[in-house]
Regions:
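Intrinsically disordered, low-complexity non-transmembrane regions of multi-pass membrane transporters
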Residues: 1-28, 57-85, 253-282, 529-537
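Interfacial loop/helix-cap signal at membrane boundaries in integral membrane proteins
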Residues: 13, 17-20, 56-107, 217-225, ...
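Juxtamembrane interface elements at the cytosolic ends of transmembrane helices
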Residues: 15, 123-129, 242-273, 300-313, ...
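Membrane-core helix-loop-helix motifs of multi-pass transport proteins
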Residues: 23-27, 163-259, 277-283, 457-459, ...
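Core transmembrane alpha-helical segments of multi-pass membrane transporters/permeases
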Residues: 29-41, 45, 67-127, 321-391
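Hydrophobic core segments of alpha-helical transmembrane domains in multi-pass membrane transport
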Residues: 36-52, 110-118, 149-151, 189-193, ...
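Hydrophobic alpha-helical transmembrane segments of multi-pass integral membrane proteins
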Residues: 110-111, 138-169, 174, 371-378, ...
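Helix-loop-helix module between adjacent transmembrane segments
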Residues: 112-122, 130, 134, 140, ...
């Protein structure tokens, strides 16, 4: 599949109204890295002010070991604001700078998973898997299948945008349906359904890394569970699929009318190339066997009688599974790595071990912007903890919310709404969550809401506004795909196609989040809506 190249400059905006304002304001924002530089500067000034004014926060505590920065006296845990310019904090900043970065949980997780994912992507496994999933589909069931594949394509890194979305335009055209309908449905699933998936994957590992850093501000023992949102993200797929199906087939397609154009020679050539070859089918079969082998090994390490390195026998209940949950990062990596290798060998995209190493190198090289971002995000979160402003904001914020007696479903919907508002201007899910998590995660823990539930609410809000803003990083690319079929498509045209999806997702997502909390449904294996702080009275 030929990869389209996004325009070098932002798409010109001749529209007026709210969305045009969003685009103009968003274009004025600096790079996420510079946002964190400014946040760090603001935090340093705020720490001096807080220390001078004697800011503090307290809560009852009966545990053995208080969180870092807290002091226990007479059964009360107290945090006092500390200037980041104290001798001790300056020493941490300067001497421990490398350690602050290397101990940043999301960075290590992303680097490890990318070693496998980069091989799978560059060997062609993800592309072939997506193309194979769309072949020989009945015309009437194109849309629901596109929804399911689109929301699971998040495992395939950028392939969902670069391969799947333009391919859907081709597939719809080949089925005699309007290609823009296919592109819109695919974009709604891939981008608007960003929070949904059938199984946990790289995004879960990444976001829970930030959640863990934030949760440990008040509970140093809290450890992430990559499966902690599994049932929630699966429910998103179940909820969003009929919504996309209805809007696509009943609203958007009648509005666009029948497609009367003819694909040019380049598009016909791409349609021909989208066919999965016999070699690729054989490679997919071997990749499936490799994935099953990895799953079998990990299952054996957890279930084999007398030999269970992935089970903590010293714990009870679901706590025994903590090593298994943490080992899933390695499992994802090996599934991608071995699947990519056997597929690449089958289709001859990998001819030697040096090809595998080269693919890994290219994958890590593509993470350079993220590593730069991680340096500043790691220091922001660490300095938030050193200054004690994180737990102070969480404790006082939780106390204020308790006084208001607002129901938990409403509070989490507010988190979701705030996340979706930020998403209009800042596209990066990790950038937004790394800034929000140090405040909202511990605050909601003190309100009895688990880090997993707060993360789920954030993910829902971060998802649906992706398709409602021209600042989404792939928006110019999707617009370019549309213009290959209709050169008159503009920013307003694409937004008008995607807004019905975004609005429907917003209403349904808020209702689902509120219902999940109200009925206290489990979020995933070993993950619940509610939480109790160890040692808190």
């Amino acid at each position: 599949m030929t990869q389209a190249t996004p325009p070098a400059k932002p798409v010109p905006n001749t529209q007026r109204g709210f969305l045009a304002w969003v685009e103009r304001v968003g274009n004025l924002l600096p790079d996420p890295v510079m946002i964190f530089v400014w946040l760090i500067g603001f935090l340093m000034v705020l720490s001096v002010i807080g220390s001078a004014l004697g800011w503090s926060a307290s809560l009852p505590f009966s545990g053995e070991k208080p969180p870092s920065g807290g002091v226990v006296k007479d059964g009360v845990l107290t945090f006092e604001a500390t200037s980041l310019f104290t001798e001790d904090n300056l020493k941490k900043l300067i001497v421990d700078m490398p350690r602050t970065l290397t101990s940043f949980a999301p960075l290590g997780v992303v680097l490890v998973v990318m070693l496998g994912a980069s091989v799978a992507e560059r060997a062609g496994l993800f592309s072939a898997l997506i193309r194979n999933s769309l072949r020989d589909l009945p015309r009437a069931f194109l849309t629901p299948v596109v929804c399911l594949i689109g929301m699971t394509s998040h495992h395939a890194s950028d392939a969902g945008y670069v391969v799947f979305i333009p391919l859907c335009g081709l597939v719809y055209a080949a089925a005699g349906r309007h290609p823009l309908v296919g592109i819109a449905a695919a974009c709604a699933a891939v981008s608007g359904g960003f929070a949904g998936n059938i199984t946990p994957g790289q995004l879960d590992v990444l976001l829970f890394g930030f959640t863990q850093e934030a949760a440990r501000i008040i509970d140093p023992t809290w450890t992430m569970n990559p499966l902690g949102n599994w049932w929630f993200i699966l429910a998103i797929v179940v909820l969003f699929t009929p919504i996309i199906w209805f809007i696509t087939d009943r609203m958007l397609e009648p509005r666009l009318g029948p497609w009367t154009g003819n694909p040019d020679d380049d598009l016909k050539a791409e349609l021909t190339k989208s066919v999965v070859t016999a070699e690729e089918k054989r490679g997919l079969a071997w990749a499936g066997i490799a994935a099953l082998a990895v799953i079998a090994v990990f299952a054996a390490l957890a279930l084999w009688p007398g030999f269970t390195p992935l089970i903590d026998e010293s714990q009870k209940g679901t706590a025994q599974l903590q090593p298994f949950y943490q080992g899933l990062i390695a499992a994802f990596t090996l599934i991608f790595l071995l699947g990519g290798i056997v597929f690449g060998v089958s289709v001859k995209s990998i001819r030697s071990s040096s090809d595998v190493v080269t693919m890994m190198n290219e994958g890590i090289r593509s993470l350079a912007p993220y590593i730069v971002f991680a340096f500043f995000a790691a220091h922001f979160i660490a300095m938030f903890s050193w200054s004690n402003l994180g737990p102070i904001a969480a404790i006082n914020g939780a106390a204020a919310l308790k006084e208001l007696s607002l129901p938990a479903p409403f509070l989490l919907v507010c988190v979701q709404a705030f996340s979706s508002f930020l998403d209009l201007f800042i596209g990066s899910a990790s950038a937004k969550w790394s800034a929000m998590a140090p405040v909202v995660v511990p605050m909601f823990m003190l309100l009895g809401i688990s880090p997993e539930m707060t993360t789920a609410a954030y993910r829902m809000g971060d998802s649906y506004t992706n398709i409602a803003t021209p600042l989404m990083s792939y928006f110019p690319l999707v617009l370019a795909f549309c213009r290959r079929w209709d050169k008159n498509v503009g920013v307003g045209t694409l937004l008008s196609m995607m807004l019905p999806f975004a609005l429907a997702f917003m209403v349904a997502g808020m209702a689902m989040t509120a219902a999940w909390v109200y009925f206290d449904w489990p979020l995933g294996p070993g993950a619940t809506v509610h939480y109790s702080l160890p040692g808190a009275k």
